[in-house]
Design a protein with these regions (language model features):
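Extracytoplasmic/periplasmic solute-binding protein
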Residues: 168-171, 177, 201-251
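Hinge/lid segment of periplasmic solute-binding proteins
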Residues: 126-178, 192, 201, 207, ...
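Glycine-centered hinge/linker elements that transmit conformational signals in sensory
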Residues: 206, 247-279
Length: 457
């Protein structure tokens, strides 16, 4: 009983430890109407039923879906909404009520739901900082892994959603950390894509001299900076990356020279002016807007934002010229250019307390049918699925999509989970709240490493 109580408390505190992929603070309704002052959206269908026994007998079934994708008109939110609409059309006794909040609001509400009872289907992340404590607290329902043998999941993609040999969720994406850049801006100014990290820092000065922001960075949320640090560490430490992080998190000792080196390099990067003024307090949407309106030459984020190439809210001259490159090689580092920071991040799970659990699992399984999330995601250019998408490639994809696929295909190794998601929720909270201070010089490198180490004890 004592362990159970402690686990529940941990689950409540882990709300601040979730990795984010959503960028919009604005919610769209299913009809596409803007609702800027609202933080949630509800989708219903007047014709309701389900696919379980009660539904097939005509009994109405209502599913509640809690999502971190508030933009229902573009990207992953559009894909999610499309599948919901199709499910309700095919199962006219089922109503799916969607609550879709932006990242920070989602974290806060998840904490409340941990106390009050979770909605039936929820967005989750397959990383220890999130999954371990939630599963220990009994929040998520176990899934039957054998059910997904024919779903085309990429080898190893279910590992992060597995705990003590049991499956508790399904991954949506294969995520790659990339620099998006404005190809036309680069060409017009004679700038070259950097091949080394020193090249990148030198380019920052050149771009700044032109009156343009080199890289738009979401430094306010913490996790993108932690991913950036992980990206640097992988390029520097190479195959030792996972062991270095594991040793540090398990002992609380972050004095490894590799960690010291890349943290110093992060500070040097900020000092060189690679990021915009005020990056350490600006959020996802602000950083993305700097790039999509042409104020910044680059934007550091995950491959889930490849839908920018088809987003008509972005000026055509910009969206048709968005390209990507991965972290350049670091001087003295062990990794080569094709060793990239990539992992399986966000996905979905079913609440252990759901009163319509059978229907919730059936809806989850419907979402992951190979011709649903994977196919629609590819068609809408929302990055790479955790499932095989080769059957859906037509040759008509955007140049940005093709480039991301080529990067993954040419990769020689993948980093795995970013450092901020490799420990407890306390560690995640610590590193994501302290990383701004070390990058801007408020905190020394030694103090930063000591502070995050203390959070592991």
């Amino acid at each position: 009983m004592k362990r159970k109580i402690v686990s529940v408390i941990l689950a409540l505190t882990m709300v601040f430890s979730m990795v984010g992929c959503g960028n919009s603070s604005e919610t769209k309704t299913s009809s596409g109407t803007d609702t800027e002052t609202s933080s949630e959206t509800e989708t219903t269908n007047d014709e309701t039923s389900g696919t379980d026994e009660s539904a097939s007998s005509g009994e109405e079934v209502t599913l509640r879906l809690f999502s971190n994708l508030p933009d229902r008109k573009n990207g992953q939110g559009l894909v999610e909404q499309t599948i919901i609409d199709e499910y309700m059309a095919e199962n006219p006794n089922v109503t799916i009520e969607v609550e879709a909040l932006d990242e920070e609001a989602y974290k806060t509400k998840f904490k409340a739901y941990s106390m009050e009872g979770m909605p039936d289907v929820v967005s989750i992340w397959g990383q220890p900082a999130f999954l371990d404590e939630v599963v220990d607290a009994g929040v998520l329902a176990e899934l039957n892994q054998d059910d997904y043998s024919e779903y085309g999941f990429v080898e190893g993609s279910l590992n992060g959603f597995t705990y003590d040999g049991k499956l508790y969720g399904l991954p949506r994406n294969t995520d790659i950390a990339v620099f998006y850049y404005n190809q036309k801006m680069f060409t017009d100014n004679g700038w070259e894509v950097p091949q080394t990290y020193n090249d990148l820092l030198a380019l920052a000065g050149t771009i700044k001299d032109a009156g343009i922001i080199p890289v738009a960075m979401d430094g306010g949320d913490g996790w993108p900076m932690a991913v950036y640090l992980s990206d640097l560490l992988y390029k520097y430490a190479g195959s030792d990356y996972s062991q270095i992080i594991s040793n540090a998190v398990s002992t609380g000792d972050f004095s490894a020279p590799e960690l010291q080196k890349v943290t110093e390099l992060l500070k040097e990067t900020a000092d060189a002016g690679l990021f915009q003024n005020g990056y350490d307090s600006q959020d996802y949407g602000t950083a993305m807007n700097l790039f999509t309106n042409g104020q910044a030459a680059m934007f550091y984020m995950g491959s889930w934002e490849t839908s920018m190439a088809t987003n008509e809210d972005i000026p055509e001259e910009i969206r048709t010229n968005i390209r990507v490159f991965t972290m350049p090689v670091v001087e003295g580092g062990k990794a080569q250019a094709t060793d990239i920071a990539a992992w399986n991040g966000g996905g979905y799970a079913v609440s252990a307390s759901s009163e319509v659990k059978e229907e919730a699992v059936k809806f989850l399984n419907y979402m992951y049918q190979p011709d649903k999330l994977s196919k629609y995601g590819w068609e809408n250019g929302v990055g790479l699925s955790a499932q095989d998408q080769s059957a859906y490639m037509t040759g008509e994809e955007t140049d940005l999509q093709k480039q991301v696929v080529d990067i993954l295909s040419a990769s020689t190794s993948l980093s795995g989970t970013p450092i901020n998601d490799c420990g407890s929720s306390a560690f995640k909270t610590s590193i994501e709240s302290e990383i701004q201070n070390v990058s801007n010089g408020t905190t020394s490198v030694d103090d930063f490493l000591s502070t995050i180490g203390a959070s592991c004890n």
